């Protein structure tokens, strides 16, 4: 068969076999096979050859093979098939895929400076400075809740990883000193408000047998040392019920008698807490003196009646706001009633009140503890029990646990002012202060006892009291040790 006399353009052949010399169109592979019979081939893109071009005959292909390979004898014994074509292409492709690409290097881990506040390991930059998770959360809560803290020393406490929980006042001041920004907290809060609310937590919480037993023991200890409002026969008095006076001595005598009985009940409650009597005597005294006023205020506020704006004591005596002021609460009165109103929406039951009282008492950040780590270990199951109990009781309110726990901060703020009030009362009453009130309340969280002649500025009389000095000053007669 003769080919056309017109010249046919030969496209450049590109592909995997470029190391072979270029062959006339349409050969794509080395023309090493003589006498092969090919079906008509189309163009590179599946189209027939342009007009004027014809497909070469087997004879011309054979001649081209002769010229290109120099008459290779391999072509005489090999038949060209589509499967051979596919095999060659597959082999070429696979050879390229086997070449591994070098792995990209991992970015180096980001390293932050230690926490500017306590020197603990930093988790990143928070509110303008490098800070750990603990200091970040403490600063955020303090700003969002407008917390007011009190330092019981010289307002120059050392803040580090170990001591950061011992003085909230100095910790907050150091947060400001290192550059933490109030505005960053507010902006962060506003940003979160705009975000869509997340789905309610549906996680279930189950109480272990040990925690259930612990919860039951604390509930009984609370109920048997503090009768509920419905168990009391309420009675009132008309003494100074209409206007405030500096001090009603009749009400003060009654109140001091009831307060002494309440303190004895709190000591009994503490001794019934699992693990409390296993602490050193000095630590038991330190914890009781630090938390006694906290628990007193919490207990009296759970007996608040908002309709009459009254509070009821353990013998049933019911006083209104004015009478509470005149009985000795003085400037502390409105703070206590405000706190009582804040407790109402929480709807705490006896179990929650008992657990919260136990957490107030067994707290490892109190000053002058001999074994703070042991106290912290004792507090951990109390926190877990309270969390699980609250979430089981209120499954649709997952944020109730932190709300209730934050009340400890409010209690500490009020009781710090209460300790100062006990000191000033000594100068207002004609006789001596009942010894148990003076011992347990006046010295709470480091306040030294004062005499009228050494009153002066209260802030000047707040060094810490060590357990050894407490024992040497007659605390060995405390009901705790009886």
Swiss-Prot record:
Residue ranges of the region described as Modulating: 1-114
Cellular component terms per the entry's GO annotation: cytoplasm; nucleoplasm
Zn finger limits (NR C4-type): 115-135, 151-175
Gene3D superfamilies: Erythroid Transcription Factor GATA-1, subunit A, Retinoid X Receptor
Annotated region described as Hinge, given as residue ranges: 181-209
Domains: entry comment: Composed of three domains: a modulating N-terminal domain, a DNA-binding domain and a C-terminal ligand-binding domain. The DNA-binding nuclear receptor domain and the NR LBD domain are required for binding of the RARB/RXRA heterodimer to both DR1 and DR5 DNA elements.
Protein name: Retinoic acid receptor beta
Organism for this UniProt entry: Mus musculus (Mouse)
Gene that this polypeptide is encoded by: Rarb
């Amino acid at each position: 068969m003769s080919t056309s006399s017109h010249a046919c353009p030969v496209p450049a052949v590109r592909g995997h076999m470029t190391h072979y010399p270029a062959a006339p169109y349409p050969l794509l592979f080395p023309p090493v096979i003589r006498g092969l019979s090919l079906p008509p081939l189309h163009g590179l893109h599946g189209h027939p050859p342009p007009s004027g071009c014809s497909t070469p005959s087997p004879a011309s292909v054979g001649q081209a093979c002769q010229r290109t390979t120099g008459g290779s004898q391999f072509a005489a014994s090999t038949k060209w098939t589509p499967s051979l074509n596919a095999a060659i292409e597959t082999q070429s492709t696979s050879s390229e895929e086997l070449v591994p690409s070098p792995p990209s290097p991992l970015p180096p881990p980001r390293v932050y400076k230690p926490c500017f506040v306590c020197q603990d390991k930093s988790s990143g930059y928070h509110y303008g400075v490098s800070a750990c998770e603990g200091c970040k959360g403490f600063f955020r809560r303090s700003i969002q809740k407008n917390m007011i803290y009190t330092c019981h020393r010289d307002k120059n406490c050392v803040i580090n990883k170990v001591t950061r929980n011992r003085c909230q006042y100095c910790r907050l001041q150091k947060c400001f000193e290192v550059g933490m920004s109030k505005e960053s907290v507010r902006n962060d809060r506003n940003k979160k408000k705009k975000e869509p609310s997340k789905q309610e937590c549906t996680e279930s919480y189950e109480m272990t047998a040990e925690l259930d037993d612990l919860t039951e023991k604390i509930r009984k200890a609370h109920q048997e040392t503090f009768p509920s409002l419905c168990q009391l026969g309420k009675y009132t008095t008309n003494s100074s019920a209409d206007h405030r006076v500096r001090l009603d001595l009749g009400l003060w005598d009654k109140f001091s008698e009831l307060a002494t009985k309440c303190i004895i009940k709190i000591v009994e409650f503490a001794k019934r807490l699992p693990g409390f009597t296993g602490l050193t005597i000095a630590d038991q005294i330190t914890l009781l003196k630090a938390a006694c006023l906290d628990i007193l205020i919490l207990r009296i506020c759970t007996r608040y009646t908002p309709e009459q704006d009254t509070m009821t004591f353990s013998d049933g005596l019911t006083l209104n706001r004015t009478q509470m002021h005149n009985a000795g609460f003085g400037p502390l009165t409105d703070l206590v009633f405000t706190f009582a109103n804040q407790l109402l929406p929480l709807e705490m039951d006896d179990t929650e009140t008992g657990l919260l009282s136990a957490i107030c008492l067994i707290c490892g950040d109190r000053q002058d503890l001999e074994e703070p780590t042991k106290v912290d270990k004792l507090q951990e199951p109390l926190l877990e029990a309270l969390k699980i109990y609250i979430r089981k009781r209120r499954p649709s309110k997952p944020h109730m646990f932190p709300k209730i726990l934050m009340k400890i901060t409010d209690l500490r703020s009020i009781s710090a002012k209460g300790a100062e009030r006990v000191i000033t009362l000594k100068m207002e009453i004609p006789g001596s202060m009942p010894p148990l009130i003076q011992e347990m309340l006046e010295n709470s969280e480091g306040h030294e006892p004062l005499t009228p002649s050494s009153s002066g500025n209260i802030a000047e009389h707040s060094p810490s009291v060590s357990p050894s000095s407490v024992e040497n000053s007659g605390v060995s007669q405390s009901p705790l040790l009886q």
